[in-house]
Amino acid sequence: MKKIHFIAIGGAIMHQLALALQRQGHHISGSDDEIKDPARSNLNQHGLLPKQEGWFPEKIDNTIDAIVLGMHAKANNPELLKAQELNIPIYSFPEYIYEVSKNKKRVVVAGSHGKTTITSMIMHILKYAALDFDYMVGAKVEGFSESVKLSDAPIIILEGDEYPASIIEKKPKIFFYHPHISVLSGIAWDHINVFPTYENYTDQFVHYLSHMQSDASLYFNETDDEVIRLVKQAATHIKSIPYGMPSYHFENNQPVLATKEGPIKVNVLGKHNLLNMQAAIKVCMELGVAEAMCYDAIASFTGAAKRLEKIIDTEGLIAFRDFAHAPSKLKATLQAVRENFSDYHLIACFELHTYSSLNEAFLKEYNHSMEGADEAIVFYSKEALHIKGLEDLDSNAIKAHFNTHGLHVFNNKEDLWNYVHSSVNSQTGKPICLLLMSSGTFEGIDWTPIKTV
């Protein structure tokens, strides 16, 4: 067993890796300058919560076998400097995941959107089929108590991410996984702070595809023109298999797939999720699960946390929260809800929270992204702008960039709550669907008591 120290142990996925390695019997320690829930509670429950927040170079000595370095840590982090001085092996999160999965069949789900959902669907099917597998996923998935599992299983399912691995290893995380099977779900510019141009962003996927080993399999979204372009450019040396939209119809607002096994009712919303489902099924079939069993399994899939997650279902009101934050995700999520709840009054509320979305240079990418809502709302936090070192945004500029008729913009959470509360409780005709889209929390607003009439 190894002694492993985590620099920035409080990260959402970092602390899950720490817990997974502890379950394997390794001795784990860690530090961070800020640890919030759920990481704080999870670490405390398992005896891994640091006694004090901050960085302590005295924790680093030659008895440590490995350092796992989180993206949150800066280059001048005193613990990192001490580890470098002592020549202790330093791994980014993805490098360590690869280190412990070298002898496994690695499945990597990559792309600009749909990664968490496809990964979750694959996990759900494999569990239903009783296959032994490890995994790493960026959200809580129903039926799984952890986000990271490591064991002696022969397969590992990995949600791939094009964001840099760490402050000292700035290549995208997906570069380190070396998949035997991969999915490319879609391409849409993201992470403007790291990839300032669209070409710079897509170059990362060209590199990823071109460096896949020749005996690997790639399942790609044939409905995405950019995906097709990149596959033709960089994936001619591997087996590339397209997936597309299945045949389906609706029964009582529920999609019903037309399959060889007959009609299959599924519990997901939106064409994008039906596409995601096809990717997951194809991967699982390559892993040895029969097609009929894949469809049996997927019928009971209900989604990952914050992916069109139903949070309110009461008379006259249904509400969903979704992780959507990039323009393509907004469009797909809105379209999904509009299609399933066409007879509802749709109130769509989006929080600008990521570095990209809060950067005025990127806002033009949101042009018409909120079309389809009966009421469209954009919220941003001045505190988030301050933390990210960005200039204040102008409400009129936001309205111009979104180019959506009647768009309301708020930067105060009380004003946002009051507007949504009034709108939800003043509708007298149609039932209401409230769609909350953010990678943040709307400054901690609890939406459950929103309907009072």
Q: What is the meaning of each model-derived region?
A:
Residues 117, 272-275, 325:
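A generic structural signal for residues located within well-ordered alpha-helices
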Residues 1-38, 43-51, 63-67, 83-88, ...:
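ATP-dependent carboxylate-amine ligase
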Residues 52-55, 91-98, 136-139, 234-252, ...:
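Beta-strand->loop->alpha-helix junctions that form or flank phosphate-binding loops
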Residues 3, 133, 154, 180-181, ...:
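The start of beta-strands in P-loop NTPase/AAA+ ATPase cores
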Residues 20-24, 45, 58-59, 71-220, ...:
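Phosphate-binding loop of NTP-binding sites
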Residues 33-36, 54-56, 71-74, 95, ...:
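Short, polar loop motifs at secondary-structure junctions
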Residues 264-269, 317-321:
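Short pre-catalytic strand/loop immediately N-terminal to key active-site residues, enriched for Gly-Thr
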Residues 254-259:
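Short polybasic amphipathic segments
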